[in-house]
């Protein structure tokens, strides 16, 4: 098994364990992963994975504090209702700004971050209702705007 395959298997096992909603500490997650054949796991690695995947501690059905994944863990798609939340797309010579409905910016930014750099998006910063987009090539910012408008089926500019 290659390094990438091992990493993918680890991530899948990690997510499967958290879906069980029975692990109250990072140490318990480490022990469960080791029991499932992932020997090179440390508490600090689990801490980074919990942060990366947005895991939170919450009460399960037995009222125990456990780690779990947020319901929206999957990457949203442009076919989902999210595209209806984009209100306006604006830009200057170096940056693109998307205005969204209140509370929708981080979900839309997550979709944009899943695009490849060839789609024109280097990265995003999202607040509550505003997304700052750094284009991968400012000389092609108009092409990136067109791709974003197509993605969200809007002609806003």
From Swiss-Prot:
UniProt KW keywords: Amino-acid biosynthesis, Arginine biosynthesis, Cytoplasm, DNA-binding, Repressor, Transcription, Transcription regulation
Task: Look up keyword Kinase and say if it applies.
Answer: no
According to its UniProt entry, one GO biological process term is:
protein complex oligomerization
Pathway assigned to this chain's UniProt record: Amino-acid biosynthesis; L-arginine biosynthesis [regulation]
Q: Spell out the molecular function terms from Gene Ontology.
A: arginine binding; DNA binding; DNA-binding transcription factor activity
Give its localization: Cytoplasm
Question: Which Pfam families does the record associate with it?
Answer: Arg_repressor, Arg_repressor_C
Q: What does this protein do?
A: Regulates arginine biosynthesis genes.
NCBIfam families according to UniProt: argR_whole, PRK05066.1
PANTHER family xrefs: ARGININE REPRESSOR (PTHR34471:SF1)
Instruction: Please state which protein family the record places this protein in.
Output: Belongs to the ArgR family.
What's the protein called, per UniProt?
Arginine repressor
- Source species of the chain: Colwellia psychrerythraea (strain 34H / ATCC BAA-681)
